[in-house]
């Protein structure tokens, strides 16, 4: 799952 807050 991509964390769009960090980009990771």
Swiss-Prot record:
It is found in: Secreted. The modification Tryptophan amide is found at residue 8. One of its GO terms (cellular component) is extracellular region. GO terms for biological process: flight behavior; neuropeptide signaling pathway. Its main location: secreted. PROSITE patterns: AKH (PS00256). The modification Pyrrolidone carboxylic acid is found at residue 1. Keywords: Amidation, Flight, Hormone, Neuropeptide, Pyrrolidone carboxylic acid, Secreted. The keyword Secreted applies. GO terms for molecular function: hormone activity. This hormone, released from cells in the corpora cardiaca, causes release of diglycerides from the fat body and stimulation of muscles to use these diglycerides as an energy source during energy-demanding processes. Belongs to the AKH/HRTH/RPCH family. This is Adipokinetic hormone G.
């Amino acid at each position: 799952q991509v964390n769009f807050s960090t980009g990771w």
